[in-house]
Amino acid sequence: MNGRRPISAALLGAALLLVTACGGGGGSDAGSDGKGKADKAAEANKPSEAVVTIAPKDGAGGVATSGALKVTADKGTLSQVEVEDSKGNPVQGEITGGGTSWTPAHHLAASTKYKVHAVAKDSAGRESAKDSSFTTLTPQNTFVGTFTPEDGSKVGVGMPFSVRFTRGITHPEDVEKAISIKTEPAVDVEGHWFGNDRLDFRPEKYWAAGTKVTVKMNLDGVEGRDGVYGKQVRTVKFTVGRSQVSTVDAKKHMMTVERDGKVIKKIPVTTGKPGYDTWNGQMVISERLRVTRMNGDTVGYGGEYDIKDVPHAMRLTNSGTFIHGNYWGGGTFGNVNSSHGCVGLADVRGGYDKKVSAAWFFDRSMVGDVVVVKNSHDQTVAPDNGYNGWNMSWADWKK
């Protein structure tokens, strides 16, 4: 005898039945689940049906700065598009067309290399990615904009942000779109073109005192006219000072100076005599000169006057209208209009006396202050004759 106890047939049968039942049932379920999981895994491992296309093609050079960059997805939708220049600056854009198209929000810079990374998903959620790079064109002809006020300036409430371009602009909408203005407190600011080389920006009413203005000029790569591109990227910040608006009544020979809505002084003046009447309308001080020469030859009044030391002069128009000190006018101030179109205030030769009207007004004025002339026999000043767009209605300004 080997000492082992025999296993009964009944126990052996029960054991076989147990193994068969567990093994058989488990085997059947595992086969079903395994096939399902395998099918899902196989489906997930299939290549995505989504196709990403980037224009321009990879490695392209001389690419246009506007209208050339576009990312599209076929048989899927875009989930991610990243574009950046060689310095890592991102290009903002928008996915449209139900997720099938992406375009940049603005033009690209010239002579710049860009990298594009785009991802799309098909209906099963499988991703397809594509990377590309290209370089924009190097322009042969360029333009810039000279502007006023300067960065860091403090100006009066009437001062627009004015840009004068070195080339005539034939694509004004593209150029205007490249200049953005933000203010604190916020106010709607609109641009208006005077001819094809000057663009002014202003709010509907005079700036509120204390307004902070930030201008971003992103002109690099903007095609201002066929084959002529901007090359300028600048940020300009300026602040609006206190409010000062002075009203000249040519009929009464009197100027009323208002500071922050309150009258602070009334000053006797002389304006343009018959035939040389002063412009009516709202005029903005664009230049301050403690002493300057005024020669009638420069404004079409040849031989009529040549005064080498006009004191306390502030320009109101490009055509030669000033508000200035007058030491030769005698008793005209407050009594009679005797000038060749300027607004004259009593002064002394050399402008040394701080107590006279012209010195007082000069010392309390800044570029951007407003001088309004009324009751003159001349027409209203043209909006582009100086920074005098305030003489246009808001509706006309926005056209």
Task: Give the label of every model feature segment.
Residues T53, K70-T72, E82, K115, ...:
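Soluble periplasmic/extracytoplasmic beta-strand elements of cell-envelope proteins
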Residues Q80, H117, A178, M254, ...:
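Conserved beta-strand and immediately adjacent loop positions that scaffold enzyme active sites
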Residues A120-D122, L219-V222, G261, V291, ...:
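Short, charged beta-turn/beta-strand-edge "cap" motif at the junction between a beta-strand
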Residues V157, G296-K399:
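Exported/periplasmic cell-wall-interacting domains
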Residues T148, Q244-K252, N391-K399:
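Short peripheral tails and domain-boundary helices/loops at the edges of structured domains
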Residues G227-G331:
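Gly/Pro-biased beta-strand-loop elements
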